[in-house]
Regions:
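A detector for short, charged/polar N-terminal pre-domain segments
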Residues: 1-12
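A positively charged, amphipathic N-terminal helix/segment that binds anionic biomolecules
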Residues: 3-4, 58-70
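A basic, amphipathic helix-loop patch mediating RNA/tRNA/ribosome contacts
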Residues: 13-55
Length: 70
């Protein structure tokens, strides 16, 4: 696991998670990498920027894995 990101709430949106993990610079970049199918959630490509990511989910992008913790 490359990164663990701690969230306060029950979930975080996929685009926000990528920004919080410093894997993208802004929401526009997050939108493009997600809609281009470059991001996986729990091993499956997800092209929804508003996808809710919960504790225990694993997000993969650009050779890095992020685990969401609370």
């Amino acid at each position: 696991m490359d990164l663990e990101i701690k969230i306060r709430d029950e979930f975080i949106k996929l685009g926000q998670l990528l920004k919080l993990a410093d894997l993208v610079q802004d929401g526009v970049e997050a939108k493009y990498v997600i809609t281009d199918g470059l991001v996986k959630v729990n091993g499956e490509v997800d092209d929804r920027r508003g996808r809710k990511v919960y504790e225990g989910d694993i997000v993969s992008y650009d050779g890095k894995e992020i685990k969401v913790i609370r």
